[in-house]
A protein has these predicted regions:
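Periplasmic solute-binding protein
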Residues: 1-13, 38-60, 140-146, 220-229
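Conserved C-terminal helix/tail region of periplasmic/extracytoplasmic solute-binding proteins
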Residues: 7, 203-254
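Short helix-initiation/N-cap motifs at beta->coil->alpha
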Residues: 15-22, 86-100
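Hydrophobic residues within well-ordered alpha-helices
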Residues: 20, 27, 50-53, 97-102
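Glycine-centered hinge/linker elements that transmit conformational signals in sensory
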Residues: 23-28, 60-88
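Paired acidic/hydrophobic, glycine-rich loop segments that form the ligand-binding mouth/hinge
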Residues: 78, 105-110, 126-128
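C-terminal lobe and pocket-closing loops
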Residues: 110-124, 131-226
Length: 254
């Protein structure tokens, strides 16, 4: 968030949905929007909307209701002018550009953007946890370690995968690649744990959710993306978009 914009608007950093709506509205002035997100039809959209779904207290097994609530909230930010309808075409990089160029007071994004912000943002900014609704929740992202079916050296590959996901291996990997770990036992023990801005992301680990929804996840994600497109562009109501998506999602859940 842009610290000066929030200060000029006389508001504090939002901590829940109600205060996020208030802060987004009060920091919206002219062509400057209060909030930018990535809602382009890609995995980025799923990554950004799922925390709102989880924050309702729900999950994909009740997307018709939890998804409707999440989509209605986001659509409400567009309806009151706090967020541009163009977010339906924004990538995460686009959301970052809106923020860096002063066209958005806040954005929802990930730790991978911090290096660019440090380099390019010509203003004082900081990071805060995602505001919550009934509960706190965020998405867990990053790298996946897999062994391909039919691998010639499958035994060795399994050993490597186990090592890379162990505490010792994960620490070496994360410290070398500049990433945070999903392992709770490494929280506060990585090189990046000492960075105050990155620590905000690490501190959300206890309520971070993996997108672990089985082998049909790509189809599930596509249905979520479509529901976002329909709801945020106004092509459908949030309720109808979520209900339609749920009809695809529910039979695919493990």
């Amino acid at each position: 968030y842009n610290k000066q914009m929030l200060k000029d608007a006389g508001v504090e950093v939002p901590t829940d949905w109600a205060s996020l709506k208030e802060v987004a509205k009060k920091t919206t002035k002219g062509d400057v929007k209060g909030l930018a997100i990535s809602a382009v039809k890609s995995e980025s959209a799923t990554f950004q909307v799922l925390p709102f779904v989880w924050q309702t207290g729900g999950d994909l097994n009740d997307y018709a209701t939890s998804g409707a609530t999440a989509l209605a909230y986001l659509r409400g930010l567009i309806d009151d002018g706090s967020m541009s309808e163009a977010v339906s075409n924004y990538t995460q990089e686009d959301a970052r550009t809106q923020f860096i160029t002063g066209k958005s007071a806040m954005m929802i994004n990930g730790p991978w953007e911090l290096a660019t912000l440090t380099k390019d943002a010509q203003f004082d900014w900081d990071v805060a946890p995602l505001p919550q609704d009934k509960r706190a929740a965020t998405s867990m992202g990053g790298e996946n370690v897999v062994v391909m079916n039919g691998a010639k050296q499958s035994d060795a590959a399994v050993k490597l995968a186990k090592y890379l996901t162990s505490a010792e291996g994960a620490k070496i990997y994360c410290d070398g690649s500049g990433q945070l770990s999903s392992r709770p036992d490494l929280q506060g023990k990585l090189k990046l744990s000492n960075d105050p801005k990155l620590k905000v992301f690490e501190d959300q680990l206890p309520y971070a959710h993996a997108r672990a929804y089985g082998k049909d996840y790509p189809k599930i994600s596509e249905a979520i993306q479509l529901s976002m497109q329909e709801a945020l562009t106004g092509a459908s109501t949030p309720e109808a978009a979520a209900k339609k998506a749920a009809e695809t999602i529910t039979p695919l859940l493990p």
